[in-house]
Structure formats: C-alpha cells, structure tokens
C-alpha cells in the first residue's frame, strides 16, 4: 500500500537570528578578517602581538606590515596556486576516501515531509588512514616531512584558499536551493528559518536544510554532514601537528604543553568521529540550513582558530612539568566525563527507556510524544553537556600561561631568552599578557557560542513543546551551570 506524502507543513514563525541581515553581513565579511588578524598579529617574525601594537604613540602602518610579514605585493600575495591546489587536493582526497573505504549507512531523523535521508559514515576510517600516512612520513623524515614544511611556508595562502572555498560552497548551495520543490523524491527541504526572503540573511543562515550533490565516480554527498566532521576537524589535527613540527625545527624539541594540547584536541575530534551517527540528532543537522555560517565555521574557523595555541607555542615554548600536566589532564577528564556521560544517558533513554541504566529516571511526557528528562544529568541543567564541553576547552588555552612574546635579532644575548636554531631570541618582555587576547580567545568564544546555542535550543523547544516546556523549565531551572546559570 502506497504511503501518502505529508501535506506541506504549516510555516512556523521564525524571527531573525544573529541580529538579522546586519549581523549576517558582519559575521560573513568581518570574521574572515578576524582570522587573518589573529594569524598576522601573532607571528614568528616580530612577536605576539606585533611590537607596533604596544606602542600606540609611535605606531606606523608601514612598520606593522613589516612586523607581521604582510606580502610585498599586497592583497594579491594572500593567495597562491600552491595553496589553492593543496586545498583542492586535500578535499578531493577526502571525497575519494569517503567513497572507497568501508562505511555504515544510517537513516537520519524524520523530515517534515515524512521521509528520511540515508547517510554514509566512515570518517573514522578515512581520517585514521590520512593520519597514518602523515605519521609514516614523519617517522621517515621527521619535522622536515614536506607536508609540515609546506604548511608552515604557505600557511596564509592555504587559509585564503579555504576562505574562498567557504564563500563558493555557500553561494552554490544557496542558488541551488531554489530548485527545491515540495514533494520531491529526493526529500529535499528548505530550513524552517532559512527562507526569510532576505538574500544576504538566507545565504548566511542556510536556505536548504540538507543540500546534497551527485559527484561523478563518488556518488551522492550530503554537503553539510560531509563538511561538519571531515576537512575542518581533520585539518584541526593536521594544523596542530604542523605547529609541533615547527617547534621542533625552531628549537630541536617539542614541549609537553604542545603535546598535551595536540593530544587532547585529537581525543576530542576522535570522539566525534567514533560517535559519528550521533551527529544526526544535533541542531546543525536537524534544524539549521547550510549556508555561510556553517560553511565558514567548518572549513575555516575550526582549523585556523582552534589551533592558535599550538601556533603560539611553536615560537614561545612553555613547559608544564608533572604537576601542570596533571592539572590539565584532570580538567580534561572532568569535562569529558560530564560531556560523554550526559550524552550517553540521553541517547540510551531515547533508544531504550527500559534500559536498567536509565529506567529509573523521571521525565515529563509531552503532548508531542517526546519525553523530557528531569532527573539524572539532565535534571541538573538543561544542557549539562555544554558545561562539560566548555570545561574541556580550558586546557586548550591555559598551557600558554601569561601569553605574549617578542622576537629579538640573533646575538642579542638576553638572559632567559629561548634561542631558535637560526639564532633569533624569544623573550616575553612587555608583550607578556597581551598575547592572552589571542591564545585565550577560544575559551571566551566557545562559552558565548554555547550560551547562544542553548538560547536557540530553548526557543526551538518552547515552540515545539509549548506549556510542557514551560513546566519542564520550572523543574530544571538551570540552563548550563547547575545553580549558577
């Protein structure tokens, strides 16, 4: 018996997010500039931050350009064929591995049309393969492995190519979204909050919910899911490893702080890959359209902003010692335990409420059929997993200490300076503390991101559950931090 397609769902009222079109414009065109600023201002030429920025009375733009390594041919020097071809090759390799390596197929959540999309998951295999190749090259050639030296020498140009890529893919999916027709056999849908009618805002927030493309020899690729966990997350680990290699080329050693940050961030990423199917129930997949917001975040923001600490340490090494390492690992363990335990509890309850590990939990039965947990981890706060996620971010930044350094010319003979292999000397001097604006940015940003996500989720749940959600909020009063927020 044929299944009747659902009628078009009633349009849910959604206001603008991110301050509407002005916010969309600012994020889309100023965040890329901010990434450039971070990576120019904190550099391996003059210091972190560049010395001119600490001397406002004698500030000179020409001097600043020299200190940060601004290309001699200006903006044109921000791009290169080498950097662009590297980005193309990297993404083509990701697509090939996506197709040829073993994978599992999982159905996504039910769409408003009543259908379900199928997803092909093998990110763990493809990423492990890539890392194994890089590890083999490093074992054979050490820190001089061409991948590591190429990334250091073409760092800004690779960044530029990825920024351009994020703009191109955002524009492609936006234009293509106008071919979505109700009742189509491919289960294509528009995102509820992504077709406001404002071109800039819809391009930014994402007009189509799950844009897919058929690629010759590769097959169908879900663009949003593919970019969520593959090139950017993998790039984050690769970027960290390249800065560890740079530290070794600079000094002949790799500090415990660099190893710690690289290892714990890799653990975080591997956890995402290991639990790849769990992405199907996240807001990114079920609710948000795919536009510039997610494209830029996946392709550029994650690998280039999240690796700022290891880049800093490649120039100014910091040794934590046994006690420092123990403290950082303790924070990581606490955050990871909260994050994973809470998510596992929720997933077990959704899958099998009679599971002995969760059958004792109390809940509110909503009119929509869903159950809202009011005890256990989710009785402590509405997003206790966000607290664990945020705690995990602290050891990413804390190892940089009172960050900031100045790079002096060879032969300065400054007491206590770190001396690079090329003779240049690195001291903190008057830059001490100012570098924290860059190396601790992640903690601040991630906290704001999680608060914003919680607010968005709260609004979505209130629209979905109505008075049941209001009752739930009376029982579980805290949003993220139990008793505080």
Curated annotation (Swiss-Prot):
Xref: Gene3D superfamilies: 1.20.120.1630
InterPro entries: ERG24_DHCR-like, Sterol_reductase_CS
Reported consequences of knocking out the gene: In contrast to the disruption of ERG24B, does not affect sensitivity to amine fungicides.
GO biological process: ergosterol biosynthetic process
Subcellular location field: Endoplasmic reticulum membrane
Glycosylation site residues: 240
Family: Belongs to the ERG4/ERG24 family.
Protein name: Delta(14)-sterol reductase ERG24A
Species, as recorded: Gibberella zeae (strain ATCC MYA-4620 / CBS 123657 / FGSC 9075 / NRRL 31084 / PH-1) (Wheat head blight fungus)
